[in-house]
Structures are given as C-alpha cells and as structure tokens.
C-alpha cells in the first residue's frame, strides 16, 4: 500500500543540500525549496530515508517526514 509523505529538510552545507535535493527528486514532487510530496510504499520509504541520511550531518542537519495517510491518487509526475 502506498502512503503519502510530506518531506522537508534543513541542510546546513550547500554541497550536502544539493545531494539531498537530487535524491529527493527521485522519490517525489518538489513543492517548495526543501519540501517534497512523496507517494511511497514501505520499501521506497526506507530506501529514501537511507539515501538522505547518507548525506546528512546529524549534528547540523534535520529532516522531517510526515505521514499524510494512504495515497488516494498518484502524485503528478510532470511537476
């Protein structure tokens, strides 16, 4: 079952920020700077979290993943 997630992050270093942004483009729709809407199954969510955390500095960076519930429709892939 696919669930919808709102993902937002604050990355202190610009180089890491660009890497996280590139990862997130593979998982969801870019809504605003550092904010994505993603429809993911459990495996995709775990992979996304791992990919993001590979580039994060736990002392200075933050990520927030909010579960918005069951995805009732696919996210528009053109955005």
Name what the model sees in each region:
Residues 1-6, 12-79:
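Basic nucleic-acid-binding interfaces
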